[in-house]
């Protein structure tokens, strides 16, 4: 994928890379994962991030890979602007300490593409942000974490919602003079399949309890459909 065309992620037509990984010419590692979230909606998905999962809930999300969860620079009522401070593994690999700084969609997508996707029901949730490769990840003059980019885009369907997850690891490194060879050494090829498997597993696992949890926490505003 041309990394300057993020708007294409909001188009439900099949992408060249829906599930897999590739090394871009500048060395950035692109991982794509598609996950079917049965009985879930984009509203539920966005709420999960806005609720800022605790360590206990974070472990529910992925019982083998997730270790700890904390939140920094919290903004009430939204995940945007907050930083998720986590420790996790990718498919059982050595644990990593990471920062995820959630951002507004219009920082990465054009306003027209967002509006078109919403009007045409091509998207029901957009979760996006910047990733840091350590808890001491550097920031630029605007306070933005320097490192990677991540996108989770939901589209509601008759059976639930489909999730597109795309990661661009090392996104900021070329701009500070790192060569493609440098990026290969810093972010090895083995990271791609490990992150792909991790992503598919964590969101499949999330889909199995998110509907009940969402309704339990929002029963004053959403109907509860009893199974009997």
Question: What do these predicted regions represent?
Answer:
Residues 52, 97-104, 178, 182-186:
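Surface-exposed flexible segments
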Residues 1-26, 139-228:
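Terminal "cap-and-tail" regions of soluble proteins that handle hydrophobic small molecules
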């Amino acid at each position: 994928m041309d990394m300057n065309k993020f708007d294409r992620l909001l188009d439900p037509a099949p992408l060249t890379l829906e599930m897999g990984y590739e090394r871009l010419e500048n060395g950035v590692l692109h991982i794509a994962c598609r996950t079917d979230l049965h009985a879930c909606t984009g509203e539920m998905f966005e709420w999960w991030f806005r609720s800022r999962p605790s360590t206990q809930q974070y472990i529910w999300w992925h019982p083998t890979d997730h270790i700890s969860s904390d939140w920094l620079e919290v903004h009430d009522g939204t995940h945007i602007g907050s930083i998720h401070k986590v420790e996790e593994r990718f498919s059982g690999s050595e644990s990593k300490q990471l920062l995820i700084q959630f951002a507004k969609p219009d920082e990465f997508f054009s306003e027209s593409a967002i509006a078109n996707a919403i009007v045409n029901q091509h998207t029901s949730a957009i979760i996006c942000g910047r990733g840091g490769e350590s808890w001491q990840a550097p920031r630029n003059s605007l306070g933005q974490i320097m490192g990677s980019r991540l996108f989770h885009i939901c589209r509601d369907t008759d059976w639930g919602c489909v999730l597109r997850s795309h990661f661009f690891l090392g996104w900021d490194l070329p701009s500070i003079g790192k060569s493609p060879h440098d990026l290969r050494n810093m972010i090895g090829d083995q990271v791609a399949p490990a992150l792909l498997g991790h992503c598919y597993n964590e969101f499949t696992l999330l889909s199995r309890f998110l509907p009940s949890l969402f309704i339990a926490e929002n029963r004053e505003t959403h109907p509860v459909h009893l199974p009997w």
